[in-house]
Amino acid sequence: MDSTKSTEETAINIPRESSSTKHKIAVAAVKAVATPHKRGGMKRGVAIFDFILRICALAAALAATATMGTTDQTLPFFTQFFQFQASYDDLPTFTFFVIANAIASGYLVLSLPFSIVAIVRPHVTGVKLLLLILDTVLVAFTTAAAASAAAIVYLAHNGNSNTNWFAICQQFNDFCQRTSGAVVASFIAAAIFIFLVVLSAVALRRH
């Protein structure tokens, strides 16, 4: 009798796991596995958007370079000593504009493979940091070129009576239209560069 009581007293009741507990553990495991995949998918989506923006910026920079670099107009009338002609290389500001946008176009072409690497390997931060630094440099470069050219285009359209600079766009209409279009395209490229910098900074911050 005593042995029976001692056996009952020393028996340990091990509670069985309920089905709800097993379900919670399974859900937690699934969430732990799904979270990295979700973050990776989000980063890949940001990298794809970055690639698309670079193509758009490349198109804008190339348009600005080609338009300004081929701007040349000669008026149909001339005198014995003068021929009225306007070309982009008559002004150093426009020459700098063409060079700056050509450099921006070349950089964008070279940055596309790095952007593809960021798509394939979205967790790599070195490539994103490099692009962020170079994009910031190109923001300043393209903005300076576009702003300086915009000042010259404004003078071509309106002149400046205080300095006796006359507006020439009434005579050189095609010249002014092409230079104005090139400046607009360059500002678009600069705006896309700014957006790329913000996008890269946000992506690195979330990493």
From Swiss-Prot:
<keyword id="KW-0812">Transmembrane</keyword>
<keyword id="KW-0472">Membrane</keyword>
<feature type="topological domain" description="Cytoplasmic">
    <location>
        <begin position="117"/>
        <end position="128"/>
    </location>
</feature>
<feature type="topological domain" description="Cytoplasmic">
    <location>
        <begin position="203"/>
        <end position="207"/>
    </location>
</feature>
<keyword id="KW-0961">Cell wall biogenesis/degradation</keyword>
<feature type="transmembrane region" description="Helical">
    <location>
        <begin position="46"/>
        <end position="66"/>
    </location>
</feature>
<dbReference type="InterPro" id="IPR006459">
    <property type="entry name" value="CASP/CASPL"/>
</dbReference>
<protein>
    <recommendedName>
        <fullName>Casparian strip membrane protein 3</fullName>
    </recommendedName>
</protein>
<dbReference type="GO" id="GO:0071555">
    <property type="term" value="P:cell wall organization"/>
</dbReference>
<feature type="topological domain" description="Extracellular">
    <location>
        <begin position="150"/>
        <end position="181"/>
    </location>
</feature>
<dbReference type="InterPro" id="IPR006702">
    <property type="entry name" value="CASP_dom"/>
</dbReference>
<feature type="topological domain" description="Extracellular">
    <location>
        <begin position="67"/>
        <end position="95"/>
    </location>
</feature>
<keyword id="KW-1003">Cell membrane</keyword>
<feature type="topological domain" description="Cytoplasmic">
    <location>
        <begin position="1"/>
        <end position="45"/>
    </location>
</feature>
<comment type="function">
    <text>Regulates membrane-cell wall junctions and localized cell wall deposition. Required for establishment of the Casparian strip membrane domain (CSD) and the subsequent formation of Casparian strips, a cell wall modification of the root endodermis that determines an apoplastic barrier between the intraorganismal apoplasm and the extraorganismal apoplasm and prevents lateral diffusion.</text>
</comment>
<dbReference type="GO" id="GO:0005886">
    <property type="term" value="C:plasma membrane"/>
</dbReference>
<comment type="similarity">
    <text>Belongs to the Casparian strip membrane proteins (CASP) family.</text>
</comment>
<comment type="subunit">
    <text>Homodimer and heterodimers.</text>
</comment>
<feature type="transmembrane region" description="Helical">
    <location>
        <begin position="182"/>
        <end position="202"/>
    </location>
</feature>
<dbReference type="Pfam" id="PF04535">
    <property type="entry name" value="CASP_dom"/>
</dbReference>
<keyword id="KW-1133">Transmembrane helix</keyword>
<feature type="transmembrane region" description="Helical">
    <location>
        <begin position="96"/>
        <end position="116"/>
    </location>
</feature>
<feature type="transmembrane region" description="Helical">
    <location>
        <begin position="129"/>
        <end position="149"/>
    </location>
</feature>
<dbReference type="InterPro" id="IPR044173">
    <property type="entry name" value="CASPL"/>
</dbReference>
